[in-house]
């Protein structure tokens, strides 16, 4: 295994651990044994097969990261009903001008 494939494997396991409800060791994470077995199979594979596995693993890692980020964003911005204009403007980075009462 190359250094980049090991890095990808570690990152996948890290993302799976974050997504897992259990707080135990990484060996208890769903899919841990399967991933290690798949990575061990590629040890003796030809270069084209290894590239295919690495590409698929990086896609899977991207999927896991984006799912985690989506959940985090949903928690921050989940629907709370109608929001005031000032709050929505602040959320998207705008600053509304101050309004003065002319009376």
Curated annotation (Swiss-Prot):
InterPro entries given in the database record: FMC1_homologue
GO cellular component terms listed in the entry, alphabetical order: mitochondrion
PANTHER family: PROTEIN FMC1 HOMOLOG
Record-stated family: Belongs to the FMC1 family.
Name of the protein: Protein FMC1 homolog
Organism this protein belongs to: Nematostella vectensis
Phylogenetic classification of the source organism: Eukaryota, Metazoa, Cnidaria, Anthozoa, Hexacorallia
